[in-house]
């Protein structure tokens, strides 16, 4: 792909897995070490070569660099402000810290897993104030489970790796997700309105249901 050539990485037909540790400091601190461990487990358990590309938000470059240096890994960095969109289209799979990126990857039909981990108190309060089914935008908009969401206690390298291996082995999943991606695009481009307007209308309609 053009992204690999820009990153000066040889395309050997490897599986490309995007890692998105989030854009907030606490997210990166909690989640990036987990993603590094996941990358090591997947490299051991999957025979085909894997290329892990980590998307880094502009405000977290220093922190990401510090964490990556502390934990030996084979992860390559992709700067969001330079190549973020190309990373999405070049990915075979993704592991995403929940947020708007879940919608971006869903619209591209990329098989993905969403996850989130925070401190105990924030998780405790969050579970009581937020409907967990509504955290992942594509799931909520489509009204069905498009993307697995792994939260808090289950957000550990072993469990995430198991889920990713299952996703990679499911040969029907990419075609299935492309169908859902079209449904999402149709919903979000309806009535000649912008994505933003349609997302706002869909969310308001669901909240008022």
Regions found by a protein language model. Give the residues of each.
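Nucleotide-activated sugar donor-binding and catalytic core shared by glycosyltransferases
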Residues: 1-209
């Amino acid at each position: 792909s053009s992204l690999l050539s820009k990153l000066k990485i040889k395309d050997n037909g490897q599986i490309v897995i995007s890692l998105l540790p989030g854009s907030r400091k606490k997210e990166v601190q909690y989640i990036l070490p987990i993603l590094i461990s996941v990358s090591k487990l997947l490299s051991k358990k999957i025979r085909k070569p894997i290329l892990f590309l980590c998307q880094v938000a502009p405000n977290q470059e220093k922190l990401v660099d510090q964490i990556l240096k502390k934990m030996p890994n084979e992860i390559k960095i992709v700067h969001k402000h330079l190549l973020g969109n190309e990373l999405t289209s070049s990915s075979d799979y993704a592991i995403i810290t929940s947020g708007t990126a879940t919608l971006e990857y869903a619209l591209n039909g990329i098989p993905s897993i969403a996850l989130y981990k925070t401190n105990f108190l924030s998780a405790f309060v969050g579970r009581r104030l937020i409907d967990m089914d509504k955290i992942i935008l594509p799931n909520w908009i489509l009204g069905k489970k498009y993307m697995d969401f792994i939260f808090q206690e289950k957000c550990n390298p072993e469990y995430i790796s198991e889920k990713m291996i299952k996703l990679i082995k499911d040969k029907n999943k990419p075609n299935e997700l492309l169908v859902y991606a079209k449904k999402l695009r149709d919903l979000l481009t309806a009535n000649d309105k912008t994505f933003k307007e349609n997302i706002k209308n869909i969310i308001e309609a669901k909240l008022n249901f």
